[in-house]
């Protein structure tokens, strides 16, 4: 499992990968390629890219809710991984909005922890 805080990858309220975010995902793609080489061919696997937000409401024309923002961020990461040579047949993007927090508190530290992208390599 890989976890990236959203602030490393995106600016606030955006689903566009920033420069640092692209650098991080390029490094991740390199690591993934090494891991993928070791997976036996008959094992069907998938890398799930999960977008998560904090509980602060967002309501813009592009992102009417945190579900849209979290999903758009996951899709951005998936598309970038495809551009780095990871097969799209082994990728899935999901958005959880604010509904799967890792920190249930209602403060800025919790918000920071809850804004994240999680990547999980699992058997299909």
Summary of predicted features, one role per range:
Residues 1-2, 23, 37:
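Charged linear interaction tracts used for macromolecular binding and regulation
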């Amino acid at each position: 499992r890989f976890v990236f805080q959203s602030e490393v990858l995106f600016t606030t309220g955006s689903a566009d990968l920033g420069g640092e975010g692209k650098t991080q995902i390029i490094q991740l793609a390199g690591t993934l390629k090494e891991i993928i080489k070791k997976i036996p061919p008959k094992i069907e696997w998938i890398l799930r890219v999960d977008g998560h937000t904090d509980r602060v409401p967002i309501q813009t024309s592009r992102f009417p809710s945190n579900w849209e923002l979290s999903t758009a961020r996951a899709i951005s990461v998936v598309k970038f991984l495809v551009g780095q040579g990871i097969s799209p047949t082994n990728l899935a993007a999901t958005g959880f909005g604010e509904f799967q927090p890792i920190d249930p508190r209602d403060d800025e530290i919790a918000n920071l922890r809850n804004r994240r992208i999680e990547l999980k390599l699992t058997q299909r």
